[in-house]
From Swiss-Prot:
Catalyzes the reversible isomerization of glucose-6-phosphate to fructose-6-phosphate. Keywords: Cytoplasm, Gluconeogenesis, Glycolysis, Isomerase. InterPro entries: G6P_Isomerase, Phosphoglucose_isomerase_CS, SIS_dom_sf, SIS_PGI_1, SIS_PGI_2. This is Glucose-6-phosphate isomerase. One of its GO terms (cellular component) is cytosol. It comes from Aster yellows witches'-broom phytoplasma (strain AYWB). GO terms for biological process: gluconeogenesis; glucose 6-phosphate metabolic process; glycolytic process. It catalyses: alpha-D-glucose 6-phosphate = beta-D-fructose 6-phosphate.
């Protein structure tokens, strides 16, 4: 199960005093989250989703997948929360060197003609389908990609057969994409109206790609459900998600920290870090408040950003995501003719060495006046992906409400869109 280690912050904060001070406020916010009907109806469709998850929907998705047994590629079209959760879950659980069938590829998450042209070339001799994800259908990046990929798939299979290869995840009642799907006769899946994109990983937005990627969705939802129960505690001392949220809040408001870095030590967590960045940045970056969130993947980034973190401006704190046990591992061999001077690690696994690097780095950074939280999970499996993703969602809600902002909207995103459309439209 997940463990939150706060030993790396005690030199920087009077933690006991602060927990006593903020426990009543956190209890009040918790009650608001779970009892405010207006808030729940508008924004919190994700909050109790693990409790009421519709497993019949998974069977519907499996039937759809089985209808295309020879599919080589599913192209998931989306941006922001419409693709980050799916990408995070798939890369959390799969090795990059063992491709599943179908392979899950992504489009519509940028405007790169080079990327899309090469994707089309890759798909030319493949058996493929599309899952386009957008609540409204008006977000430019995925809409552009869908226009081009829709044309391509219709030219390859013919319009009638192509419509059985296009799956639409969108609003249930309204929107350009829904209207298009109904007119064309595409299979549709629903994004609940009360679930924002960055909180949508356990809806059809994430689950359909997970099913096509052959992930264990049932175990994932068991993990999310356990996380729901564990974070349902209104008592701060019994709720690790709320402790994490409070620590973030205190470093930002009382220690004047400007940035949080999520530190991981496994490449499988690179896309999870991107999902985490969107979750917190889009939730808290309002009213000139909020931490700037970044991510490092060590030990790679110890040879680039590590210098700044150790001795640069003391503007940040770190949250280390530690996976304590790795399924697939390497052992360093012993060599008699030791020309490389590495026999001091002979017999050790890569995981054991990686853990020593993690421990040494935390110690060095704490001594370098960089506060360190540590979140430990036992392994990289579907259960712990579900647990961890829900943990961060709940922590994010508490963290934003502690700041006094609404963590569930994102009006700032619309500003660049307005200016972009003004430049693009005649």
């Amino acid at each position: 199960m997940l463990k939150l280690n706060l030993e790396g912050i005690y030199n920087f904060l009077d933690w006991r005093k602060h927990t006593q001070t903020y426990a009543p406020q956190i209890k009040s916010i918790h009650q608001k989250l779970h009892q405010d009907k207006q808030l729940k109806e508008k924004y919190l469709g994700w909050l109790e989703l693990p409790l009421h998850f519709d497993f019949k929907e998974i069977e519907k998705m499996k039937q759809l997948k089985n209808f295309h047994p020879n599919l080589d590629v599913l192209v998931v079209i989306g941006i922001g929360g419409s693709y980050l959760g799916a990408k995070a879950g798939i890369e959390f659980l799969q090795t990059p060197f063992k491709k599943t069938k179908p392979e899950i590829l992504f489009a519509g998450h940028q405007v790169s003609g080079n990327y899309l042209t090469n994707l089309l070339h890759f798909l030319k001799n493949k058996n493929w389908a599309i899952n386009v994800i957008s609540k409204s259908g008006t977000t430019l990046e995925p809409a552009l990609a869908f226009r081009i990929l829709k044309k391509e798939i219709e030219e390859k299979y013919g319009k009638q057969l192509a419509k059985n290869r296009i799956f639409v995840t969108t609003d249930s009642q309204k929107g350009v994409l829904l209207n298009l799907a109904l007119k064309e006769g595409y299979q549709t899946f629903v994004i609940p109206d009360s679930v924002g994109g960055r909180f949508s990983v356990f809806t059809s937005v994430g689950i359909l790609p997970f099913v096509f990627a052959n992930l264990d969705v049932a175990s994932m939802m068991k993990g999310a459900l356990q996380s729901y129960h564990d974070t349902f505690q209104e008592d701060l001392l019994q709720n690790q998600a709320y402790k994490y949220a409070l620590a973030r809040y205190l470093f930002h408001t009382q220690q004047n920290k400007k940035m949080e870095i999520l530190v991981s030590y496994e490449p499988n967590l690179l896309s999870f870090s991107e999902w985490w960045k969107q979750l917190f940045a889009e939730s808290e970056g309002k009213e000139e408040k909020g931490l700037f969130v970044g991510a490092t993947n060590n030990s790679t980034d110890l040879h680039s950003l590590g210098q700044f973190i150790q001795e640069g401006t003391k503007m940040l704190f770190e949250t280390v995501l530690n996976v304590s046990s790795i399924k697939d591992d390497c052992v360093v061999p012993h060599i008699l003719n030791e020309l490389d001077n590495l026999n001091y690690v002979a017999g050790k696994t890569y995981s054991q060495i990686n853990q020593k690097i993690l421990q040494a780095t935390r110690q060095a950074h704490i001594e370098g006046k960089v506060p360190n939280l540590e979140i430990v999970i036992p392994t990289l499996d579907a259960y712990h992906f579900g647990y961890l993703a829900y943990f961060f969602q709940k922590a994010c809600a508490m963290s934003g409400l502690l700041l006094g902002i609404n963590p569930f909207n994102q009006h700032g995103v619309e500003i660049y869109k307005q200016k972009m459309f003004a430049l693009l439209k005649p």
